[in-house]
């Protein structure tokens, strides 16, 4: 997540990798406030199961804001069962137009095992090119590393873990304590 978008806020890396019939979303565990590590074992990747429809989501940004958005996404998925794209667009529209939601500082990567999207507060619902998406302070490092490995024989999980390890080595706001969730269609 760009520091200029959320001044004074740093920290976290989330990656989504779609390969071999599955999607893996992985996130580091570091929570930073300024130059201080507050926690190293946070879980920023979650499973959602509204109405028995399974989705994995990873978030970067304010935890409280992200949980608010995840709750809204669950409600949208309950209203549009099995339609992650539609639920994501509806969430992004609300996020963009609702005065309360506009103030939320977070980004999401979501997947149902078939589709994967990055959802932003600017109203974007982006389906990543090259089957890799990454957000957060180390997102560009993880994205570049994962894209370099996509043609290898590594599984989606191996690509995600290796890319996160590289990001953690480069980005001071990212650690190697990973939460990894897999989902397949």
Swiss-Prot record:
Domain of life: Bacteria
Keyword terms, alphabetized: Allosteric enzyme, Cytoplasm, Hydrolase, Metal-binding, Protease, Sodium, Threonine protease
Gene of this entry: hslV
Any Gene Ontology biological process: proteolysis involved in protein catabolic process
Source species taxonomy: Bacteria, Pseudomonadati, Pseudomonadota, Alphaproteobacteria, Rhodobacterales
Known partners and oligomeric status: A double ring-shaped homohexamer of HslV is capped on each side by a ring-shaped HslU homohexamer. The assembly of the HslU/HslV complex is dependent on binding of ATP.
Active site positions: 12
InterPro entries: ATP-dep_Prtase_HsIV_su, Ntn_hydrolases_N, Proteasome_sua/b, Proteasome_suB-type
Record: residues binding Na(+): 168, 171, 174
GO terms under cellular component: HslUV protease complex; proteasome core complex
Reactions listed under catalytic activity: ATP-dependent cleavage of peptide bonds with broad specificity
Protein name as annotated: ATP-dependent protease subunit HslV
EC supergroup of this enzyme: hydrolase
Job of this protein: Protease subunit of a proteasome-like degradation complex believed to be a general protein degrading machinery.
Gene3D superfamilies reported for this sequence: Glutamine Phosphoribosylpyrophosphate, subunit 1, domain 1
Description of activity control: Allosterically activated by HslU binding.
Subcellular location: Cytoplasm
Similarity-based family: Belongs to the peptidase T1B family. HslV subfamily.
CDD domains, sorted: protease_HslV
Enzyme Commission (EC) number: 3.4.25.2
Cysteines engaged in disulfide bonds, as pairs: none
Organism listed in the record: Ruegeria pomeroyi (strain ATCC 700808 / DSM 15171 / DSS-3)
GO MF entries: metal ion binding; threonine-type endopeptidase activity
């Amino acid at each position: 997540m760009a520091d200029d978008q959320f001044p004074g806020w740093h920290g976290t890396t989330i990656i989504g990798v779609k390969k071999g019939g599955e999607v893996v979303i992985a996130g580091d565990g570091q929570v930073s406030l300024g130059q201080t590590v507050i926690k190293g074992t946070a879980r920023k990747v979650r499973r959602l199961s509204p109405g028995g429809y399974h989705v994995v989501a990873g978030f970067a940004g304010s935890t409280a804001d992200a949980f608010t958005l995840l709750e809204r996404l669950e409600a949208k998925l309950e209203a549009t069962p099995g339609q992650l794209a539609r639920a994501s667009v509806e969430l992004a529209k609300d996020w963009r137009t609702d005065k309360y939601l506009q103030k939320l500082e977070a980004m999401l990567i979501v997947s149902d095992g078939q589709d994967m999207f990055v959802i932003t507060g600017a109203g974007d619902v982006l389906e990543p090119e090259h089957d890799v998406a990454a957000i957060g302070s180390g997102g560009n490092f993880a994205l570049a590393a994962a894209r370099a490995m996509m043609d290898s024989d590594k599984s989606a999980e191996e690509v995600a873990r290796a890319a996160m390890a590289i990001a953690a080595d480069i980005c001071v706001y990212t650690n190697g304590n990973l939460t990894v969730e897999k989902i397949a269609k």
